[in-house]
Amino acid sequence: MEISTLTTILDTTLAVIFTWVAYKTGQIIWKYTPYSYPNARIRAMEARLLTDQRFSELAESKTLQNFVVSLEDTDYSPRLASLQSYNLYEIERALDLSLVDLVELMIKIMPKRIRGLFEILLEEWDVRNITNVIKAKLSNLPPQDFIIPAGRMFPKVKAMVESKTMEEILVILEGTEYEEPLRKLLLKEIDLQAFELELYKIYYSKLLKYASSRKGEEKLISEEFIKMLIDYRNISIILRAKLSGMPSEEIKSLLIPGGMLSRAVLESMLSSEDVMMALGELEGTRYGDALKDVREAVEGGRIDKVEEALRRYILNRMKELSQFYPLSVAVALTYLLERESEVRKLKAVAKLIEDKAKPEKIKELIGEMA
């Protein structure tokens, strides 16, 4: 073989190798670099999460004013600093708004290709606000006391608050995905509970549709996250409904499609004779180990202990994913769950302080929460 031929082959081979290396390098840069800044920022915020020692100190606050002052050096300070009075309603509202601020921050700093997930997560406030306005209107209560200035439809929510009739609200929601469920409610085709569930079905359907449109790790992580949230709601619905004696067919209509639990498991839970048997159907699932210590609590009607165990499982699973995929959306979703857990605990501390509970009792109850 002539030298010129060998040189040509060598040049071609090197060109192919360099092209492949450049392609792979480009893939890595596209895949991971956009997460470097947001995840570094989130890790810094994660370091500021409240420790058990800090919660013990908060339990000693004695008054809500002291409780708020004790949080001045935390990420809750911007919202708590604007309080007009130190009452439980205002404090809980400020804590909720701190979570809204967090999701809005994620929308700003996360890579464009996953930003839509957080935009849809923000829509849960649309569901909450719309549901709360309808509930308040039907109960002749002031709806403005039950809404949070958050969500993508807040201008419409404000218009709903000012409306005089339910028909006006239907006009306000015209053209949105929430119009039809409200129409069914007004026609008495569904009750208020079913109306709320219809809104949540729309919400989770949008989340799943978005997650399934992603690629690679982003699809894997976001789909598992959303499906676990759906399982959480479905398990809670089934167990609470079983406890209240609701017929299986009625429970089935309340379930949200798209979770990780198989249809067979859900059907077995639905056909179970009682709440304990329904819980037993989860033993062979991914949630089995997490729920093995709550049977006694469930026998006493404490479904909240199941919910705590499931929240703890979901958080731990997301932590695993964030460790396995350190430059991914798992880091942001894990931190969001951590902050939601922290807010639940802070609300509980505030409520117990208002109720004049002893610090020792507050510490005991908070230590059990998830």
Swiss-Prot record:
Family annotation (Pfam families): vATP-synt_AC39
UniProt KW keywords: ATP synthesis, Cell membrane, Hydrogen ion transport, Ion transport, Membrane, Transport
Record InterPro entries: ATPase_csu/dsu_sf, ATPase_V0-cplx_csu, ATPase_V0-cplx_csu/dsu, V-ATPase_V0D/AC39_subunit, V-type_ATPase_csu/dsu, V-type_ATPase_csu/dsu_dom_3
Gene Ontology molecular function terms on file: ATP binding; proton-transporting ATP synthase activity, rotational mechanism; proton-transporting ATPase activity, rotational mechanism
Recorded GO CC terms: plasma membrane; proton-transporting V-type ATPase, V0 domain
Subcellular location: Cell membrane
One GO BP annotation of this record: proton motive force-driven plasma membrane ATP synthesis
Disulfide bonds: none
Assigned protein family: Belongs to the V-ATPase V0D/AC39 subunit family.
Reported function: Component of the A-type ATP synthase that produces ATP from ADP in the presence of a proton gradient across the membrane.
NCBIfam families per record: AhaC, PRK01198.1-5
Subunit note: Has multiple subunits with at least A(3), B(3), C, D, E, F, H, I and proteolipid K(x).
Protein name: A-type ATP synthase subunit C
